[in-house]
């Protein structure tokens, strides 16, 4: 019985010590590398984007090419500019991106996700507006696998009665 009593006392002492920090929100601090850049990884479908941002004039480079040549369609450029517009930080950061996998739409979504995360690493106070718009959430939708006995994931083979 004496051991149970002492273990209970130990548990209560531990709860008392940790009880104050238990309900507090985590404090987000600025995370920069040795070159003064913020780094983040974004994902969408099969695409993975690695994003570095630093203060600058608004130059965006994707896989060592200007964003206008890599993402030729204006809709794709608009997608990856969205976090900057929500945060009112357009033309304030130089952005370097390496993106692999997937198609152009998935890559643009991955860059948007990574850019939003990198902005929160550089300026933690931007976390709430970017989170409110859903840019910090990884989109879990991926392609459904093909099933055997079917032509595609859900499409059946053509059925003939006779």
Swiss-Prot record:
Keyword field contains Ribonucleoprotein: yes
InterPro entries, A to Z: Ribosomal_Su5_D2-typ_SF (IPR020568), Ribosomal_uS9 (IPR000754), Ribosomal_uS9_bac/plastid (IPR023035), Ribosomal_uS9_CS (IPR020574), Ribsml_uS5_D2-typ_fold_subgr (IPR014721)
Keywords, alphabetical: Ribonucleoprotein, Ribosomal protein
One Pfam family it belongs to: Ribosomal_S9
A GO cellular component annotation in the UniProt record: cytosolic small ribosomal subunit
Name this protein carries in UniProt: Small ribosomal subunit protein uS9
Family annotation (PANTHER family): RIBOSOMAL PROTEIN S9, SMALL RIBOSOMAL SUBUNIT PROTEIN US9M
Record GO biological process: translation
Keyword set includes Repressor: no
Transmembrane domains' residue ranges: none
A GO MF term: RNA binding
Entry's family note: Belongs to the universal ribosomal protein uS9 family.
């Amino acid at each position: 019985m004496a051991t149970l009593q002492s273990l209970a006392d130990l548990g209560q002492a531990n709860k008392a010590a940790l009880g104050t920090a238990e309900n507090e929100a985590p404090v987000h601090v600025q995370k920069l590398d040795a070159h003064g850049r913020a780094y983040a990884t974004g994902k969408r479908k099969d695409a993975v984007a690695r994003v570095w941002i630093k203060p600058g004039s608004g130059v965006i480079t994707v896989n060592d090419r200007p964003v206008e040549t890599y993402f030729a369609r204006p809709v794709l450029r608009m997608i990856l500019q969205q976090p900057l517009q929500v945060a009112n930080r357009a033309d304030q950061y130089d952005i370097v991106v390496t993106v692999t996998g997937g198609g152009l739409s998935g890559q643009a979504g991955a860059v948007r996700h990574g850019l939003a995360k990198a902005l929160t690493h550089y300026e933690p106070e931007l976390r709430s507006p970017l989170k409110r718009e859903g840019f910090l959430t990884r989109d879990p939708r991926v392609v459904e696998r093909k099933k055997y006995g079917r032509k595609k994931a859900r499409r059946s083979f053509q059925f003939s009665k006779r």
